UniProtKB/Swiss-Prot annotation:
Protein name: Prophage integrase IntE
Keyword Signal: no
Matches recorded under SUPFAM superfamilies: DNA breaking-rejoining enzymes, DNA-binding domain
InterPro entries, alphabetized: CB, DNA-bd_dom_sf, DNA_brk_join_enz, Integrase-like_cat_sf, Integrase_catalytic, Integrase_lambda-typ_DNA-bd_N, Integrase_recombinase_N
Entry keyword annotation includes RNA-binding: no
Residue ranges constituting the Core-binding (CB) domain according to the UniProt record: 82-167
Gene Ontology molecular function: DNA binding; protein heterodimerization activity; site-specific recombinase activity
Protein source organism: Escherichia coli (strain K12)
């Protein structure tokens, strides 16, 4: 005679086995701890354990939020501090409103999600006024140790803003900002700058392969704009003899005269725009000249396609980049700034930077140039 199946071989709370003599099987049920109702989970023990464990976790989180909410209401009424988790809920709501009103860009909004989630995970149960420098420093150290200093910079920047907002709403004392007290993570930039000679080599290969690549590279060098903005440029953006650009990253509005000429390559913006006009009807300056398996004739060339084809042409040019990583499409923006600076142009306005310090970063050739001794 077969042995009777064990009925109580699991220790997951609220999970119960029900043995059926009729079919000689064990059915699993989950008992809701609040309503007392049973929910059938079938005969698969592993699945039943997983479902019950997940249900218990969610109920525990729900209870924790309810307890925190009650605790925070009491604390607020008594003028005491609230928990970090509750403040982060309010901070998220503030960011939602800022996004809707246009105060921040979508990319900025998305960038805040991970750092907020990390702080909630590590210090959500602590009072917001009890989060200290060590809590933040430990978060940053993990990214630095993993070789991700750029992400550490992002986390620090967002958490500085979290505590700035907390100050504005009186949830922490004035000046209280443990994130600001942490050391700024340093990131060594290994990507090489692009020289004009290197640009010409890449341009010749890229233009011969895809004419739209030649157009995109000329626009990048003559206008100094970012990759995404170049991809989105339309003929309808041209009026009053200017090309109008609303920068995707910052929202800056720039009107570039068609008469602007980059002397180093002897191309004006008007010349480049004329080159972009061809037999393919398109709303975009950078567009496909013929239909392909992935795009129709006249369709916009997306930023990813420009990046990929630039990299291919760059590799075919067989340029020695030394110990650094090869230049990317974006490096044309720095080259443009340096060439226009030699012409005496106000490159800060052209690039759409709020401060001269931002522009100066682009002017740094990262060791490519030579310092000449004046006699």
């Amino acid at each position: 005679m077969a042995a009777r199946p064990r009925k109580n071989n699991v220790s997951v709370p609220n999970l119960y086995p029900l043995y059926s003599r009729k079919v000689n099987k064990v059915y699993w049920r989950y008992k809701h701890p609040v309503t007392g109702k049973f929910h059938a989970l079938g005969t698969n023990e592993a699945e039943a354990i997983a479902i019950a464990t997940e249900a218990n976790t969610r109920l525990a989180e729900q209870r924790t939020r309810q307890i925190l909410a009650i605790s925070d209401r009491i604390a607020t009424s008594k003028g005491k501090a609230i928990t970090t988790s509750t403040w982060l809920d309010r901070y998220q709501a503030i960011q939602d409103d800022r996004l809707k009103s246009g105060d921040i860009r979508l990319n900025t909004y998305k960038q805040k999600a991970k750092p907020v989630s990390l702080l909630r995970e590590r210090a959500g149960m602590k009072l917001i006024s009890a989060v200290d420098v060590r809590d933040i420093a430990q978060l940053l150290d993990e990214y630095i140790a993993a070789g991700r200093p750029r992400m550490a910079q992002v986390v620090r920047s967002v958490l500085i803003d979290v505590f700035k907002e907390a100050q504005h709403y009186g949830e922490v004392p004035p000046g209280y900002n443990p994130a600001l007290a942490t050391k700024q993570p340093r990131r060594k930039i290994t990507r090489q700058r692009l020289s004009l000679e290197e640009w010409k080599k890449i341009f010749d290969i890229a233009d011969a392969t895809h004419r739209y690549m030649g157009n995109a590279m000329l626009l990048a060098l003559v206008t100094g704009q970012r990759l995404g903005d170049i991809s989105r440029m339309k003929f309808s953006d041209i009026w009053d003899d200017h090309l109008h650009v609303i920068q995707e990253k910052t929202g800056s509005k720039i009107a570039i005269p068609l008469s602007l000429r980059l002397n180093a390559i002897n191309w004006s913006l008007r010349d480049v725009v004329a080159r972009c006009r061809d037999y393919a009807v398109s709303a975009y300056l950078v567009h496909f000249f013929r239909s392909t398996s992935q795009a129709e004739r006249g369709a916009q060339v997306k930023a990813n396609t420009l990046t990929m084809n630039f990299s291919k042409a760059r590799d075919l040019a067989r340029i020695d980049w030394g110990e650094g990583s090869p230049a990317t499409f974006h490096e044309q923006r720095s080259l443009s700034e340096r060439l226009y600076k030699e012409q005496g142009l106000d490159t800060q306005k052209l690039l759409g930077h709020k401060t001269q310090q931002q522009t100066d970063r682009y002017h740094d050739d990262r060791g490519k140039g030579w310092s000449k001794v004046a006699l």
